[in-house]
């Protein structure tokens, strides 16, 4: 344990100043704590006061403090430590290793995981929102069901059965505010436990799981996906089985069978993150793990890739034995997601506008992918069959990221931003969705020039 992990609140000399805004006291407290952690006034390992004590000191209700602590734990800033209360989990000194918005303005955005915001279906969404608002019952404006609006859960269940092949009913669906919250709910519902996570994976996701008080063990990946045969006594496994993020391979049929057999024998759960599953361009669609074993697989989906990250809605298909615990954590986090947004998405799904938009964007992203692959001919490329980005294996990712930045292109290195828990393998994630249509070819040309300036062509691309 390092020195800064034993810091006590009483020794920090910290005063919290709450700036009241439209979000109220709880939001003000969350903002104040985030700021204190981010700027280092509350180092990692600092033990925060008990909720009752801080509520008394600040002159707010205990529920306000509890709600703020719960939300920040879900976001990875705090974690509950048995016998030691709530402690700071985020390390401000390591923030540079996490994926972040570029510190400068780039002409072209080729970072991963971002859809084309300029293609958001504004007219269709506005139409759905108007219909939802006009038809909303009065109780839709009151506190609602933590599971989500019945209208949306019904439409999501129908969509997931039809389009994604799930074995799911309305009562299995829990609506969340996106995958970040979904993962936090499950991590806290099972905490404290041992959680197996892919290596590499998003560092933010590791932070969320750890913040809930869980022990993380890493699962190495190879060309057949996560090495699930290495699983031991974990209670939870978090995977991107259909398209491993960031490397892009698919979990093989043999390993899927091994994983599900393991989960049945041990009574464990698997989170299958289907973060960009609607966008497959080559080969047949891959069936979901949940469709094979709904008693042990939690399916996680989100509107962030199909519509936009600003539509803060996600969904879980949760096994019956885990459902009550997940719903309880959702209620503790924020009670329920926004009712009007839920009703709008329900109408969007019901009217088939969602399907039309996904089909349109799938064709557009496929064309972009083809352009990018053509520019990268002779390079070591992974993950080309699906998704919103490629993984380009390089010898010096920092040099390539810098060369791209010099040409106004934002890309993201994997090793340098903390994706690897073990020995890092250099590579750059190149997104082809976020850049507007009119600028995409210019972005590809600029990135290809950056790549040519730092590394020669080598082996052929890999799918």
PLM regions: where:
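N-terminal basic, amphipathic alpha-helical segments
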Residues: 1-132, 136, 141, 152, ...
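A generic "structured core" feature
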Residues: 47, 199, 204-208, 259, ...
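Short glycine-rich anion-binding loops that position phosphate/pyrophosphate groups of nucleotides
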Residues: 113-116, 241-245, 305, 435
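Conserved core of the PLP fold type I
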Residues: 139-266, 278-298, 365, 396-397, ...
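Residue-level detector of anion-binding/catalytic polar loops
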Residues: 215, 269, 409-410
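Active-site PLP attachment segment
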Residues: 293-325, 337-340
